[in-house]
Amino acid sequence: MKLFITGIGTDVGKTIASSILVEALEADYWKPIQAGDLDNSDTNKVEKYVSNPTTKFHKNAYALQTPASPHYAAAIDGITIHLNQIKEPKTINHLVVEGAGGILVPLNTTDCVIDIIQPDYKVIVVSRHYLGSINHTLMTIEILKSRKLNVAGIIFSGDENKATESIILEKTNVLMLGRIDNEPYFDQNVIKYYADLFREKLLALSI
């Protein structure tokens, strides 16, 4: 099973969610494009959070120096991102693929993050409540569905907001996989706790 993790924007909790999914499934992890923070990349963070011995952490297709939209970060580095250079790693394990920002973040003048998503990927959307998050969540899911991509579930990150979550679930008819609370900190034990909570629903996606 291949899961693509996207968010409704930046800093909504994709990397924590990815860590939980990797731990729950003993999956491999791949972040095709990393923009900035190369000394403490998302791959480094997930590797720190995951404790199972099975997971492999695959190399970024592009590791860009500047924390910015990939198209701009690539331009600063003097390169252009090409989709044909983003090659999915081979593995016999489940694979968790983490996107960069939201689905319409540009990679170059023609392609966006959504264009990395393959037909056999199951997409999981991470949503976090803020003013405007309902609109951003509904638009994200609507665009994914318009591309005939498989939206397998939604994860809510942060404090619960029942009014926000209920209208999102009602309008999208997407499965809620779980919630990641605003924890004081995240470490391997906290990630494992959530992995145990999420595992059953995640495994059901592969059936």
Language-model regions, residue ranges each:
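N-terminal phosphate/diphosphate-binding loop that engages ATP/GTP or pyrophosphate donors
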Residues: 16-80, 93
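Short, surface-exposed connector motifs at secondary-structure boundaries
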Residues: 26-28, 120-124, 145-152
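Histidine-anchored nucleotide/phosphate-binding helix
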Residues: 22, 114-117, 135-145
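Short internal beta-strands
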Residues: 31-33, 124-127, 152-158
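Glycine-rich phosphate-binding P-loop
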Residues: 3-21
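Phosphate-binding/switch loop-helix module in NTP-utilizing enzymes
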Residues: 69-107, 114
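Inter-motif core of Ras-like GTPase G domains
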Residues: 108-130
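C-terminal lobe/tail of nucleotide-utilizing enzymes
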Residues: 141-207
